[in-house]
Amino acid sequence: MLKNTILIGLFASNFLLFSCSEYEKAIFESVSLTENWTFQSENLEEALEADVPGNFTMDLMHHGLIKHPYIKAYASHLETGCEDVIYRCEFDFPGMHYPYQDLVFDGIDTYATVFLNGELLGKTDNMHRQYRFSIENLKEENNRLEVIISAPLNVLDSLVAASQFVLPEDFAHMRKAAFQFGWDWAPETPSLGIWRDVRIEGYEDFRLISSWVETQAIQDESAEMMLVVKLDVKTETELKLDFQSDDFYFVSQTVSLQAGEAVLHFPFTIESPELWYPNGMGNSFLYPAKLRMKTDNGMLEKQMNFGVRTIKLRRDKDSIGEIFEFVVNGIPVFAKGANYVPQDAFLVHENHEALLQSCVDANFNMLRVWGGGIYEDEQFYELCDSLGIMIWQDFMFACALYPGYNQFFDNVRQEVQYQTDRLRGHACLALWCGNNEVKNAWFDWGWQSVFNWSDADSVQIWKQNTFLFDTLIPDILSESGVASDYLPSSPVWGWGHDESLTEGDNHYWGVWWGEEPFEAYRKHTGRFMSEFGFQAWPTQKMLDYMHDGEVLEIESDIMIAHQRHPFGDRLIRETMQQYFYIPETAVAYGQMSQQVQAFGISEAIRWFRTQPKCSGSLYWQLNDCWPAISWSSIDYFGEWKALHYAVKDAYAPYMLYAVQVHNKLMGYVVSDAPENRDVMLSLEWFDDEGLLVFTETKRIRSEAYNHRSEFVLDVPQSLQSNTGWQLEMKLKTDNEILAKYTYSPKF
């Protein structure tokens, strides 16, 4: 199709705003189709009411046909991925009279055939894409929409059978959320459904595909901005476009459009801009603006909030290797956060507000949206914009090798284009990443020998995967002018490689998978720690829900069903014994598991923050998709585990730490607060009976954004002969305690 690119400039200046009343007719209308749905499978004699958006498994549960998969061990008995399901909706449709009408599905999971009034509209094969079908045979009454969704496991069997190669993970053959096929924190739930919004859209001369604002450059007193509007133009037309806030016209222009896809660029300048900053660095300010587009047939209006900021991933060479550091508005940032996974195994229950507020409350400034889940909805990213949570966005590829045929690549191409168009304008978006652990797996997991590939097959398999992540995806980003940086694979090096400590990001799993003690984090600190973690039980509230009246036991069928890691229970128990003790009751055992997790991971975070070479800490994982024994700091109910409280202190703007380094007790003061400040460090030494032995103070000038100071702590002579003493560290101003830390030589 014809692609028009238009560049028109205007300085933002004060004007009186025009009244919307001059545009009385809308040239776009959207009508929801999320009501009056039924579903029927081959095992159901009659159709039953369905939830849309929703999921087949949850529909069965709502009708009492299966037990809730999250209770007891019922998830082990699910068999909902093996039957086709028909979703039907009958609706009347009077009143929409536009020359162009589309039926739009924002998400179908996954392989579906769509009929409207008996006419085949098309098929779907990617749950990560929007599907749009042109419709012409709507009736005012008694329209019948049918979506026949194929059983995912049956489709998968046919795809695997047709594959040129035996690939390590079958799920790689389909564009469906990988975690639904089971992970070491998630149940096997390969279900199906219409999982996002469905609607009919009507429009006149054009359809707005997407619009966004990018920051081109920030100078001392101004910011150079770019409004980009992407249109599907149906007929040659003249378009009057206005982009404005309550105080400013940013853009006001008239352009002539030809039929085809048009990408319009409108540069503008904001004088004395208020900048967007991540949480803890300053205000996450968003300019509220409206985009209005008028033709002779009427007007379309869209609310657009945008931030003025630059975010770059700095990867310069240095004396150690290569820096891996995010820089926001010219200021280096230590990334503080975690890895985010889908909030529900069936993608039906999400509470973005509460979960993201918990991130802010724990002093996060970044989340990594992990590549085995989903691209989140608009509300998620809008909240991250307003809360100041930067997003490291994986594309949805994880822990697998992917097929290399053209149809698969074309499918991915459309997915990437859709998602980047949708998300690129968010102030929170810091990085696009091609995948999770694909490169790591290829070089370190031994798949070549496990699957007995020939040398020629190995070359071809790796070639098609490097094409996917090193060519296809970055080429789309480049051709589309995506400003955010791109990383082909995370981690850059696996945790067994020396390079993982000197360049790129690091998934350090020597602790846990390698069964190393927590102290190993101090020997294996990389430039950016993007995965590390340790498991614990969920909260008591979650345990009570899982057991549904049955007695909680340390080892039971229920607990085994909710522990997805092959040696997780053993490792929790052994580590508990190593650092603390093993309680006798199940309630105390669960609480102690949380204390172990909180101790180990918060100690690691504090250490990472003291190391000048390290620029980020994203622990595994923030949240759960179901009631689980897992690495999360917040359980499925949104309840904080002990780790989240510990992380709140470890990620605080001011942080203290003490640790034995080369036979010396070292003390650290770290701050990323956005202001210079004179503070006082108080050191109180207590003997093994809790008696105060010695007190000293140090005055420190804390520098804005990136302060680290370290010093030797001299243990009082009277305490050197035993290990029962404690050091209480406090960082204070005249009227405020900024940070605390307790050190004990026992640990």
Predicted segments — roles?
Residues 337, 371, 393-395, 433-436, ...:
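Active-site proximal loops enriched in glycine and acidic residues that flank catalytic Cys/His/Asp
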